[in-house]
């Protein structure tokens, strides 16, 4: 076999004129550096020298970067590209020669291998931080530079120049090798690892030494950054274990909110300084954002420009390849030049295919890099803005919130909406300047291809694009309207769920259900409008390119002198697709730009709003230990009785003989000549001169609205000081100087506000409030506030979460936790603002005695107490009496008795009145009621937890095995069953129509492209000149018209099907819930049910339809593309299998990880928003405690947690898109090579390449939409889980027509051996109860908690399961009656009075059956007639949600009037007087005795004494009727249970 390295000609090996004069030997010389590098590096890499010699042990795989790291990677990639060009040029040149010449491409191949090895070698050296091994690379670059220079000089001597491609390639390689050599020299200079005694040691970045930092994008090498390779571990591991917050770790320092806040704050402060010089100018947030975040946006824009320019390589390469195939130029030349020119090189179809592949890889890499940089910058901006807003909230003037200048809703909008608007605008920013370039370039290329006819198509796009903007504005309007109706529907649904027990007992479910359905119909009407405009938007996106292509090609057919060529046609098609995208995106960018401008205006207004006065603003926080408090020096002759009973008389007090403030300078706070305002300019408090003694109890009293709370806030610095000063004595000296201690240096104050404010945290965290936990102190505080019994009822004790995300507590319980927080804090001063307002007398007394007098005063803490409980004045060491914003009197009680007798007598009168009310209140034990409510909530919560556990077990699909494969199978499985269930909810006809229209539409689109391929191929081959094209033009026009029509049909059917499914699912859900058993509502939290009607319904309404449309469109486009490529070049099917396998695994791994990350993003948003709202609500408390820094830190942590979740989600999306884009590029390369090699039909080649390019755009959308749909189907699954619930059996064995019209007329009740339980699997709550109630008899039922009293009342209405025995009313067994009939004929008054929003008339008679006279009669009986008449509208007067515009007593009387309206002969009162005062109870009892004198009344007693005179008393114990007789007879049995209950309640 002859030698072929230099060719078969022996003269090729001639070295007569010298070795360097032979080009072949020069090429062989170029092999030396590559062989050297491979010989040196391979042993090092295989032995693992670098990794074993690592001097720095860190947990990550990527590490420090040597100097010039990024430049080295860029130069290496450039060198690899040039090597590819050199290989291609050598192969093409060799193909034109008679014999094989390996020297033309073999050195280039070795160079490619060596360069690849160099970057692998460098990466390993860098990760091991062992720079001495870089010496091999330095030698390699030097040798490569020398050999390439020799080669370049040789070419120069031969007379080659820039017109010769090989000369240009060699020149570029000399430059690149020289630059890489310079990079190595720089590393030697900086690291000093050669010829230096003391090498420079470099530690890895600080972030990488933190084990918690898992977001490695800033630290990895350039290749890993571009491909997100470092995400592989997380995404693959998601199959084995769900991704949690621990897995994603912490943010790197540079990305943390505090870092970005500092940058933005400095930039904004600079703008404020500039604006200060111009009175009419406001600081520019835009400029501040540009200064802080401009550089990454410019970098992103650069990436975007490069991506967009590379995007045009696709159409150009398609044109070139199709043209080459059409001309059939791929033949061997007999005569060939020594070297190729660039033009000749690019005329090779295979070269164009490779260039197209590389261009796609680069384009997609740059595009994803642009996306990532903008998203990261947007997240950083959002974090900085949130920190700025939060910092401003902490400095916000209290008057802004209290006077309504700024609402909590506005602040929440700033946090949740405006910052997101700016973030999204930043995401779209690069489009602003990239789009014009893309459009201009597209039009120029189209014009070059098709001439003036291309301008017609461009004009069609430009003219139709504004319609998209119009549609977008209409979509926004429809969405706002939908949101309004949705809010109204949720409000009504919430009312139904809160009052479901009453609705069922009164058989009003269908009335209220109808009301919700009416609102739902309005919402659906708005959703129809939204769906219509969405359909139009989808239609325009699909139809405009078709219309533009039609207009262009028809114009070209008749106006141009030439036939349409395949190269021109398919390149134009590709260009039109590129051109349409920026024009459509323009409307979105403009819309977001307008929103961003508005958001910046709102943000600027907020940041420039009034702040709290500088004299009261604190930079630090801290508390002084008790030991540093100034000790009380007075002599106390007689201790205060801490245990005296709850009766107080002013005349019987003994004043503690402590030194008065007038006699000592031991004063904690002093206000002189104080005038304070809430910002209006008018003084709310005037002429305030007060002193608060240290270590004593100061009480502030006065009428409602006199300024007591305002005085506390003024002292705390929350009000605007118009005049005067507030002095704090916090200097631990024997003679403190007040003039030297201003309020700016005051210490923290433990403050309990009048309105209780709690964190969304555990009970313990609310009480300790950031202070160290001290078990002994904590127990003392909870005992002092009577909290321990309440804590014992909670499922997790004091570790139970309270607030929005936890247990809802009553007002009294919330108040006591707030007071406990103030008591627990280690502060010298305690401010308590009306702490007794929500407490009953027992709790008030206990708190006063144990909490204030014992716990606080024994520690000599200064206590300032605002109260209306004048009976506690006897304990005050100092009293401040206020009236109309001024101090009326100040001093001890003795001083006031002596100096202001009139005031003293007034207090005595008020105390006597309070004492009379106290006699009544002593019987009403509010605490018992609160704890009973809490116990019920806990019972429901535990049951709900049990249900959730059962649901989780069901979700694991019966066959749960604790092994890896099972876990992976469950986590990767798509919920196809749920998808099918959703689709069929929209109706089989619409489902069929959607599938059929979708398939038909894509078939027509394929037919359009195939017709074009046939048309252009036919006329380019058979009719080279001008020919009649009417047939093809007509066919093309018809198909385009059909395609446009089908685009509209498909978009409408998808939206319509989604709307129908949403309508049916909500209708079924509402009916299922409202007809569900009462047990379901007892065991399922209200928030959980409401979530199905809010978040889940919103997903079904608005999110699933567009996702489904996008998924079906992108999937069918990809399938069409694969089908068309396979048809054009069948050999492509061979490569399809491995590509399909790769795609399968990519989507499989991504879907699981994406779902976890999306859930993390959603779950971390709520705590952040809650923290902002709770801070704004508790601003005064936070500032009083001086906990601003702690709350700032918490906000920064929550922001970073949400940001890291969002960043990982974004990185996961980039991970997917890079891989699917690269997969698409591989498809394009495979299709190109297959088309060139196997097809002679240029039209089909163009068609195949066009569809291959389409795949690159839609592959990632298939996976993204699949992942989104999987998450969204979770909402459908949740709704479906409720639809499987069993409803109450509303049917009876009797027909409603068989029930007498006036039944029950007599009111006779017979209870036969009654056994009742709540569910089949639960124990009985009533066992074999037998009783007889005569018509019109008044019956009392009593027993201890849990004895079964309320269960009996529910049994009358069949709200519980009567599994044995029966109840017969007026001769009819109630189990045979239809439920609606039974419940509509009985009346009940519940413990909790429930009113619904609407009118008084609606609340009394929702069925609208009664006349006005009957309603007025009922109101008169309930003693409400005069009050209702005084209201505007009378019977039509407005009732707010929950009846909050009426007192609890009035609401209960309305419930009584409601019961009377029904005219039933049986009335059941279930602890109806438990939550009302004594006066209202007397009214209610009187009405019942008169208005219901001839009716049977069954009273379940809250206070046993109220049923002593009842005609029949039933006493229950543990579900058994133990006593049954008249009250007097039962009292004769001294050891009986009834007697015991009566004695206990006395």
Curated annotation (Swiss-Prot):
UniProt-annotated location(s): Membrane
Location of the region described as Disordered in the Swiss-Prot/TrEMBL record: 941-964
InterPro entries given in the database record: AAA+_ATPase, ABC1_TM_dom, ABC1_TM_sf, ABC_transporter-like_ATP-bd, ABC_transporter-like_CS, ABC_transporter_C-like, ABCC8/9, ABCC9
Record keyword Nucleotide-binding present: yes
Cross-referenced SUPFAM superfamilies: ABC transporter transmembrane region, P-loop containing nucleoside triphosphate hydrolases
Domain ABC transporter positions: 669-909, 1309-1543
Domain of life of the source: Eukaryota
Domain ABC transmembrane type-1: from-to ranges: 297-595, 991-1271
Binding residues annotated for ATP 2, in chain numbering: 1343-1350
Protein name: ATP-binding cassette sub-family C member 9
Organism: Mus musculus
Gene: Abcc9
